[in-house]
């Protein structure tokens, strides 16, 4: 029998939103196991393997945090699932995927819907996936690559330095900024990043005691959806910088999965949807990826910008 853990050191990045995410996981764990003592470790505490010069949630930053976990600097790591690679480094596994918040994108503006924004409106987007899909939907938009926190981007819109911004609904919700939301963007406009809306708790694969302490907060439906999304990314084989999105949703015992790949300039967007039974997440992800590849995604991946 695996003994019950009494103390757990859990890490996250050090920005405000990451700390809120860590608190969210801590609250769930304390509700499940009130006697579990939890110590927080943050990326700016001078821990080896964490490059604090990089922006929060950047690939190198997340890689540094995962290295810290592999090296045993803490027992578990909380990461927004949208920022994880589809394949984890050797020695790590998913301890839990939390109950998913709204996975969609939202529009922040001064009371204009996306279709109502003036021609050539300036719209902030933090990554190439959002940028490419917005340009595919409205090629006239002037996309500004968003820098800084969600709060700072919202303030730029409110101060009219930007006409609008597209942000993850879950980030806005965690920051309690829902009053600024003008519109939820459907997948016909912008498919979210794989994993968006959930938090992933990573643990070392050989730490049975930690896995036992964490697994109780796993949300099975969210886990299934995200495993399918990651399988889509993995089988698609697109590079890290490619404009790729995926979203799974479960109703009863049916899992619907949709995904897309776009050209960075937004001139092309290849999209497909598949349905299947819960329990066949990897097969569904692979099937969707194959459909997207066969519909033109394979040719798109040969473009110089996506090599």
Task: Label the model's feature ranges.
Residues 62-106, 178:
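Short beta-strand-centered segments that line the small-molecule binding cleft or hinge
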Residues 67, 114, 154-155:
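Alpha-helical segments flanking ligand/cofactor-binding loops in enzyme cores
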Residues 9-11, 77, 95, 124, ...:
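Short, well-ordered beta-strand segments
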Residues 87, 133, 175:
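Glycine/Thr-rich phosphate-binding loops of Rossmann-like dinucleotide-binding domains
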Residues 1-59, 71, 81, 136-307:
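Small-molecule-sensing regulatory modules
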Residues 90-141:
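A conserved helix-loop-strand patch within extracytoplasmic ligand-binding domains
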